[in-house]
């Protein structure tokens, strides 16, 4: 089957915004006007087409980036709806990775909000061209020009209106097109009846002023237009549109539009702007990758003639077809039933069926072409960020960066039946979401889940209950402490038991010294003259290892200690392996009295990114958490603080930072090293573990 839409007539866009800016409603209207749905679903009624998970409909927020395909003005528009909540940033990142352009939705009353800054920053990193839609013009307090000013002040964006609203709040009746210099007046509730008229007299001066500003701003991005502008020649509408398109695709200019998705105003004009100003796959640089055999850099231009190359950007479990792998095709053509190479894993995969998704309904298709976004059934080994390529022309595309999880909780199944189901459920959820990790704590036997924030883990535990019918208790997280010796000492372990028949006898002298950090336990046999027979030496080492697992202070493993067995004695009849194991453990216990045992705690390297205004708060947070600042760096009006902070003090920090910075602050943390716990904290830990 031939291509239905050429590459030039394809748009891959994302819709991104702060929570509650009306992003999902905007997507709904796009689907309505492009003929994908016949009845509009309202988010506040829990009936939205794109928000198809039960939790999303209940909470009224978008959690997973649902992909859908629509048609407008002879073009195919693939849309990815992304979440606006900070706990779900991986969803935003992975959708930005496969998009060619985006629509940033603002609430016209609030303008740029904290999470808008976060997603804008991510989009800038990925060099994604954007248009801005100031939504909710019908809302009390809506102010279009204020919203535009926040784009300049908070994002330093070269953003300019290409439209102006006629009225606002309840009087929002239409839109002035600053390119055509005409007014679009809405005459019915569904926004399908639009009258084009002359600009109302009271708006003519404002329209002329903003048209002039627009022409000047666009001319500044293009030398030819600048010459015409300076020489006083008229710039035609066609030249102006071409200039806006070029500057937008180069991420030098951001056109701003207005409307009210809820009241069905401005959405069709926004769709026109998607076609007019956002890039097709042909307008953006060819994707780069590495040849797995030669390590040489290769590019894959958007073309059906090139070898097949795609990136898997999302895994989802569908109740009817099972595991779905969403992928973006960068080059080439793929038929269902064919084989591809997962070059990231070095595994061959068979593409069972190919589905085009519309939120959570699907249509089976035979072929996908370059520039398409689709979902495949039947891939066994593919995870987020993997490259899928032609077997004969392999390439590894740049993957998706996954932030480390920052919060963890213990989960415990309520019954034996739940235990088996929980393992399967957690594995499936971890496959779908790379920021969700599952670990079993070897020391406590507990299952610990880690994620990007409390809401993130709430939603996953909730999904475990709903989708997999697993009942589980969720506990508070625990820290993995360690113990060590800080001084050298010598100790004797003497064990003797004689009570008729064969007795027990073991006698050892061991020197204990602190070892380098991370070196673990080292055992040295320095026995001379057979005072401890050779066959009992392994028993001494084993006795020490077993005792060290339970520590000497609070039950945590003893690490980084050297033990040198240098003297002892034995009994011809009564000595045994068991006796020497016990003697070794007694020597360790004795050594603990003089070897200055200490509890160690994991120290995290924490990187906190926050607005300059909140720098004082952030420094206060670090100090209050027994942390120490390692360095600071200014990036525009954002400050990046690096600090070492104990893991024990970081629980709940995501929530504290979020409220201190109104969601504008983010942090990442990675384990760095173990460090001695202060004496006062050590005493508390010992008391707690001894049940005092």
From Swiss-Prot:
Keyword Protein biosynthesis: yes
Residues annotated for GTP binding in this entry: 17-24, 81-85, 135-138
UniProt keyword terms in alphabetical order: Cytoplasm, Elongation factor, GTP-binding, Nucleotide-binding, Protein biosynthesis
InterPro entries: EF-G-like_DII, EFG_II, EFG_III, EFG_III/V, EFG_IV, EFG_V, EFG_V-like, G_TR_CS
CDD domains: EF-G, EFG_III, EFG_mtEFG1_IV, EFG_mtEFG_C, EFG_mtEFG_II
Membrane-spanning segments: none
GO BP term (any one): ribosome disassembly
Origin: domain of life: Bacteria
Main location: cytoplasm
SUPFAM superfamilies given in the database record: EF-G C-terminal domain-like, P-loop containing nucleoside triphosphate hydrolases, Ribosomal protein S5 domain 2-like, Translation proteins
Disulfide bridge map: none
UniProt GO MF annotations: GTP binding; GTPase activity; translation elongation factor activity
Cellular component aspect of the GO annotation: cytoplasm
Domain tr-type G: from-to ranges: 8-282
Localisation: Cytoplasm
Described purpose of this protein according to its UniProt entry: Catalyzes the GTP-dependent ribosomal translocation step during translation elongation. During this step, the ribosome changes from the pre-translocational (PRE) to the post-translocational (POST) state as the newly formed A-site-bound peptidyl-tRNA and P-site-bound deacylated tRNA move to the P and E sites, respectively. Catalyzes the coordinated movement of the two tRNA molecules, the mRNA and conformational changes in the ribosome.
Similarity annotation: Belongs to the TRAFAC class translation factor GTPase superfamily. Classic translation factor GTPase family. EF-G/EF-2 subfamily.
The protein's name: Elongation factor G
């Amino acid at each position: 089957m031939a291509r239905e839409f050429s590459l030039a007539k394809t748009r891959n866009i994302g819709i991104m915004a702060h929570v509650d800016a009306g992003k999902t409603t905007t997507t709904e209207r796009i689907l309505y006007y492009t003929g994908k749905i016949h009845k509009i679903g309202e988010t506040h009624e829990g009936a939205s087409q794109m928000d198809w998970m039960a939790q999303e409909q209940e909470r009224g927020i978008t959690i997973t980036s649902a992909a859908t395909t629509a048609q407008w003005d002879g073009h195919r528009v693939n849309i990815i709806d992304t979440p606006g909540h900070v706990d779900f940033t991986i969803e935003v990142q992975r959708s930005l990775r496969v998009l060619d352009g985006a629509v940033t939705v603002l609430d016209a009353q609030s303008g740029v909000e904290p999470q808008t800054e976060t997603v804008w920053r991510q989009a800038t990193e990925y060099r994604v061209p954007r248009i801005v839609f100031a939504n909710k013009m019908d809302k009390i307090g809506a102010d279009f020009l204020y919203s535009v000013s926040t784009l300049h002040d908070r994002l330093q964006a070269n953003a300019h209106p290409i439209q102006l609203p006629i009225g606002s709040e309840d009087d929002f009746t239409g839109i002035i097109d600053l390119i055509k210099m005409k007014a679009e007046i809405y005459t019915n509730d569904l926004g399908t009846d639009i009258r084009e008229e002359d600009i109302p007299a009271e708006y003519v001066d404002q329209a002329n002023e903003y048209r002039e500003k627009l022409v000047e701003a666009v001319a500044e991005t293009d030398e030819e237009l600048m010459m015409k502008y300076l020489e006083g020649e008229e710039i035609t509408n066609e030249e102006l549109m071409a200039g806006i398109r070029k500057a937008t695709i180069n991420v030098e200019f951001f056109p701003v539009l207005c409307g009210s998705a809820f009241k069905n105003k401005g959405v069709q004009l926004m769709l026109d702007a998607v076609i007019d100003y956002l890039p097709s796959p042909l307008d953006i640089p060819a994707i780069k990758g590495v040849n797995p055999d030669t390590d040489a850099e290769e590019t894959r231009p958007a073309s059906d003639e090139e070898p097949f190359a795609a990136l898997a950007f999302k895994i989802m479990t569908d109740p009817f077809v099972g595991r779905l792998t969403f992928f973006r095709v960068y080059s080439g053509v793929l038929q269902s039933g064919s084989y591809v190479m997962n070059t990231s894993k070095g595994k061959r995969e068979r593409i069972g069926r190919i589905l085009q998704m519309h939120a959570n309904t699907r249509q089976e298709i035979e072929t996908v072409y370059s520039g398409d976004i689709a979902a495949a059934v039947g891939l066994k080994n593919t995870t987020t960020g993997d490259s899928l390529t032609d077997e004969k022309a392999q390439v590894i595309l740049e993957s998706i960066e996954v932030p480390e999880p920052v919060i963890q909780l213990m989960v415990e199944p309520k019954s034996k039946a739940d235990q088996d189901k929980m393992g399967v459920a957690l594995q499936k959820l971890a496959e779908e979401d790379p920021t969700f990790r599952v670990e079993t704590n070897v020391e406590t036997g507990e299952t610990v889940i880690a994620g990007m924030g409390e809401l993130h883990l709430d939603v996953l535990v909730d999904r475990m209950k709903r989708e997999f019918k697993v009942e589980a208790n969720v506990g508070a997280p625990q820290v993995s402490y360690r113990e060590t010796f800080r001084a050298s000492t010598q100790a004797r372990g003497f064990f003797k038991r004689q009570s008729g028949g064969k007795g027990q006898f073991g006698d050892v002298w061991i020197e204990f010294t602190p070892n380098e950090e991370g070196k673990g336990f080292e055992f040295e046999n320095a026995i001379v003259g057979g005072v401890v027979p050779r066959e009992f030496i392994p028993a001494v080492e084993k006795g020490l290892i077993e005792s060290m697992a339970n520590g000497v202070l609070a039950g945590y493993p003893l690490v980084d200690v050297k033990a040198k067995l240098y003297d002892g004695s034995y009994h011809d009849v009564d000595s045994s392996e068991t006796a020497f194991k016990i003697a070794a453990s007694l020597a360790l216990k004795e050594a603990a009295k003089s070897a200055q045992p200490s509890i160690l705690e994991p120290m995290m390297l924490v990187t906190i990114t926050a607005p300059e205004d909140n720098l004082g708060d952030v420094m206060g947070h670090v100090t209050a958490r027994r942390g120490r600042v390692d360095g600071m760096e200014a990036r525009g009006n954002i400050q990046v603080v690096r600090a070492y902070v104990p893991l024990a003090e970081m629980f709940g920090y995501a929530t504290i930072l979020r409220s201190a910075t109104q969601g504008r602050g983010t942090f990442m943390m990675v384990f760095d090293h173990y460090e001695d716990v202060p004496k006062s904290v050590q005493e508390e830990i010992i008391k707690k573990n001894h049940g005092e």
